[in-house]
Amino acid sequence: MASTIQALPQEVVYLITAGEVIDSFAAVVRELVENSLDAGANRIVVYLWPQQWRVRVADNGCGMNLDDLQQAASAHSTSKIRSSADLWKIHSLGFRGEALHSLTTLADVEIISRAPENVGWRVVYGDNGEATQVEATAIAPGTVVTVSNLFASCAARRQGLPTTAQQMKAVQATIQQIALCHPQTTWQVWQNDRIWFTISPAATAGQLIPQFLPQLRPGDLQEIKLEIPNPENPQLSTNNKANATTLSLVVGLPDRCHRHRPDWVRVAINGRMIKSPELEQTILAAFHRTLPRDRYPLCFLHLLISPDQINWNRNPAKTEIYLHDLSYWQEQVTQAINQTLRISAANIKESVQTTRVSQLLKAAEEKGNYNFNPQNANPADNTQHYLKAVAQVSNTYIVAEHSGGMWLVEQHIAHERVLYEQLCDNWRLIPVEPPIILYQLSPAQVAQLQRIGLDIDIFGEQLWAVRNLPAMLQQREDCAEAILELSWGGDLQTAQVAVACRSAIRNGTPMSLPEMQKLLDDWQRTRNPRTCPHGRPIYLSLDESSLSRFFRRHWVIGKSHGI
């Protein structure tokens, strides 16, 4: 019986491979732009003609000589790697040698390029990636790649693509993600011969993000850059413990900005945005109980890791990777986020403006600024007072002074944050005698109280006896009401939040200066001092520069008197 298994024709193999790499306008832009960045370009111009199925990418990179141009679109041809060992030494964005050849399978491709001190060349490629037309041409150093008649040989592919508007939205998102990983690059994007959008270069990703989210203000974001050692792994061929990893982190301060969706929880490794559910969940967990309900953080994590820690060869688009020692990196990310969200003297003077409160000062001065929330660094566990308690307003707010201005701290939610973190670190139940009697609990309420550790049993008809309770509730007169509140559902952390809220000092309670100072000191040492466990902001900041502008302290005396 003849075999039914046959080798596929070469053109079918190439078509299958091309479909894995190039599936949309965004994929074309991604592959060409990554080649530009690998060539050292710091200025990239993208032209799009979606109705004509044409894309052009021009850059000021190193360019190519004629020999490289003639080989550039050949199958499995690349300048990035030479052997299998190089798969663990990848420093470039591309390495597979598939993109340009795939494009010649699906479209008409032309490349014009010039290396410095060489003449420029124009090369047109055929379906198999071979150069069919070569001629000298005038061009500045760099490369221009034009892809025309995209998917002309695959009519079904064109029909299956989303609408033009959706494809252009995907292109914009792709360019923004790449720009975020390479903030020093200048971008200009044209659509149908009209400028569509530009991205100006920035020193860091944190300075670039406001171009994508214009509603943000610079002080809404906190950026940190850390050098951390690579983990020891004897299974790897090389062990670069001596070479540190760079961890760059940009977070939206939880009292300043958050999102309806987790669309800005982003992870990049070695210059490429990736999908890493594990690291994304680590980020979300680090912001737990710092944001309002059903809100998500703004966070961009970029790791520059030794290449031997990563396996890129898992997905043609290289968005999915295998990262060695994942738990180690998760721990480092958690520590970095915690460090970023804290408050210390190092940056207590820095603050940002809030629209809500700045209106108060605008009544007297159009440019007045009322500021909110300083940026952060490591907390200090010593007794140095970064904030000095000065007074209490309405038995609710603590006026605190520091070298750069003053803060207004809401005493109840500041104390709530302190107590909540203490409960998280030490959830302690103590026996009570006589027991607390509750009336008419449902089976679900009984099960909930038992779930969080309370000892409860039947005391009579429709009566239940609670024989222990959280230590913080021991001195309260409303213990029964507090336990009833705990019985209405939620996990242990929900119960801890409820206990902290019940136990915190109430607004309207007078406090002495030593009591206020003690609360300020305890609050500054918390892990997440910016918001209460419900996500509400804890303090307002009014810095010295705002006060000076408001009271016009920089005026010359003679001029202020009309002299």
UniProtKB/Swiss-Prot annotation:
Protein name: DNA mismatch repair protein MutL
GO BP of this protein: mismatch repair
Record CDD domains: HATPase_MutL-MLH-PMS-like (cd16926), MutL_Trans (cd00782)
GO molecular function per UniProt: ATP binding; ATP hydrolysis activity; ATP-dependent DNA damage sensor activity; mismatched DNA binding
Recorded family membership: Belongs to the DNA mismatch repair MutL/HexB family.
Matches recorded under InterPro entries: DNA_mismatch_repair_CS, DNA_mismatch_repair_MutL, DNA_mismatch_S5_2-like, HATPase_C_sf, MutL/Mlh/PMS, MutL/Mlh/Pms-like, MutL_C, MutL_C_dimsub
SMART domains: DNA_mis_repair, MutL_C
Function: This protein is involved in the repair of mismatches in DNA. It is required for dam-dependent methyl-directed DNA mismatch repair. May act as a 'molecular matchmaker', a protein that promotes the formation of a stable complex between two or more DNA-binding proteins in an ATP-dependent manner without itself being part of a final effector complex.
Family matches, as PROSITE patterns: DNA_MISMATCH_REPAIR_1
Source taxon at top rank: Bacteria
Cellular component per GO, a single term: mismatch repair complex
Pfam families with a match to the protein in the record: DNA_mis_repair, HATPase_c_3, MutL_C
Protein encoded by which gene: mutL
Keywords recorded for this protein, A-Z: DNA damage, DNA repair
